[in-house]
Amino acid sequence: MASWWRAFPQAARRYPWPTNVLLYAGLFSAGDALQQRLRGGPADWRQTRRVATLAVTFHGNFNYVWLRLLERALPGRAPRTVLAKVLCDQTVGGPIALSAFYVGMSVLQGKDDIFLDLKQKFWNTYKSGLMYWPFVQLTNFSLVPVHWRTAYTGLCAFLWATFLCFSQQSGDGTLQSIFIFLRRKEASDKSPEK
């Protein structure tokens, strides 16, 4: 195990794209598994495979290319540059990734109207993301080396994916919906068995 752990940073430097994409996809998929666990009931591995498919084919790759593009367009870690990167990420990258998630999941689930979830949940989810992602990316752009940025985003996306997958399955894209669900679940777990 120790040798694997030491080899991982070398792989990220030598093969940054596949290493970052696979790590991102694994963490994003784990977020879906966590939200299923929180909801209770049997695990839906087909759903987790769909999330993993979308994370590997789009999200991990998009984030890898997008973060490198931002670094090329706005190089450095000066405060103004970092703020410009965060602004670009939240006004361009965020909406693209969020739209791809809702539409991609609808396609993979075989829904008739692949844009319905996007239409119903985009704005609420985007606003919820604005309470999380600017702070994540502020840290990312100012402290994390370029070759680790997608992996760091994936680590932070673990929490986001938990929320996002819940919203796609049964929420409305607001943080309030998940808190209400968790409160109800806690109350039902505490109620005496009949």
From Swiss-Prot:
Cytoplasmic topological domain: 1-14, 68-91, 169-194
GO CC list: mitochondrion; peroxisomal membrane; peroxisome
Keyword Transmembrane: yes
UniProt entry keywords in alphabetical sequence: Cytoplasm, Membrane, Peroxisome, Transmembrane, Transmembrane helix
One example of a Gene Ontology biological process annotation: negative regulation of hydrogen peroxide biosynthetic process
Statement: the UniProt record of this protein carries the keyword NAD: no
Tissue specificity comment: Isoform 1 and isoform 3 are expressed in the kidney (at protein level). Isoform 1 is expressed in the kidney, spleen, heart, brain, lung and liver. Isoform 3 is expressed in the kidney. Isoform 1 and isoform 3 expression increase during development, reache their highest level in adulthood and decrease with aging.
Region (Targeting to peroxisomes): 16-55
Superkingdom, natural source: Eukaryota
Transmembrane annotation, as ranges: 15-34, 51-67, 92-110, 151-168
Ranges per topology, Lumenal: 35-50, 111-150
UniProt similarity note: Belongs to the peroxisomal membrane protein PXMP2/4 family.
Annotated protein name in UniProt: Mpv17-like protein
Organism per entry: Mus musculus
Lineage start: Eukaryota, Metazoa, Chordata, Craniata, Vertebrata
